[in-house]
Amino acid sequence: MSDARVPPQGERRAVGFVGLGQMGAPMATHLAGRGLAVYDARAEAMAPLVKAGARAARSVAEVAAHCDLVSVMVRDDAQVTEVGEEVLASARPGTVLAVHSTIRARTAEDLASRARRYGIEVVDAPVSGGFMGASAGSLAVMVGGSDEAFERCREPFGAWADLVLHMGPVGAGTRAKLARNMLHFISFTAAAEAQRLAEAAGVSLRKLGRVVRHTDAITGGAGSIMLRPTTAPLEPDDDLYDILRHTRDLGEKDLALALELADELGVDTPLARIALDRFGAGLGLVGEAND
């Protein structure tokens, strides 16, 4: 790879990417023809990016020294802190360090606090959409940082994301990602509970899965009710009041029917019972009886 190294000091490269794993590699690929510098501890991970037009660096420090924006997609808080410190030690003032890993918000905030002493800005910019979204360049990215840093990141992030949103100050992107992933993984547990009920009832799980994927693509799934700016109780004159009251009535009816079937079949469905108990309140219909 000696012919594909980052240029010497003095020639400034715009974008660098550190961490070329399952998510980082496809994200970086969308930037490869745009003067991208990359680094990964595994040389074999850099080879496809070099073939696509990127330049391989010998170290994190080498990427940081030549790039105005350094994106980092590594495993956890410890790796983010380690890589972040290497970037701070080598980057020039004015550099933006973008952390795409899912970590604690405090880790991003602490890194940003240290970075300010070097004149470097940090944005926490975790992504949602998985490997398929990264490969297609259709991820959603939730950015926490200053207005100026966000504007500098918006265009390069758009190379691999269809939705680039400024969530607030540093830490806000990570908090949004944790809430989003909480919904995602709770839904997996709910799916397992629904499958147990369907299996006990003699329903084909594969066919049921096809139905779920098909209809969620049409309705938007759980995101279809995430339309309000607050979780406070709805006022009767709210534009969404009648819509969500109708949703509440249908949901409570169908949950009750599912629980009745579960009781008949002896299937334990604790999440469904919690959902029925809290469904109306969750929609903002507190203390309002069904019609």
Question: Where in this protein do the model-derived segments appear?
Answer:
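NAD(P)+-binding Rossmann beta1-loop-alpha1 motif at the extreme N-terminus of oxidoreductases
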Residues: 1-72, 94-95, 166, 200
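Short, hinge-like loop/turn segments at secondary-structure boundaries
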Residues: 54-57, 73-74, 89, 116-117, ...
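Rossmann-fold NAD(P) dinucleotide-binding segment
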Residues: 60-121
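Helical "substrate-binding/catalytic lid" subdomain
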Residues: 173-267, 271, 278-291
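Hydrophobic beta-strand scaffold residues
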Residues: 36, 56, 121-123, 205, ...
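Rossmann-fold dinucleotide-binding core
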Residues: 15-18, 102-181
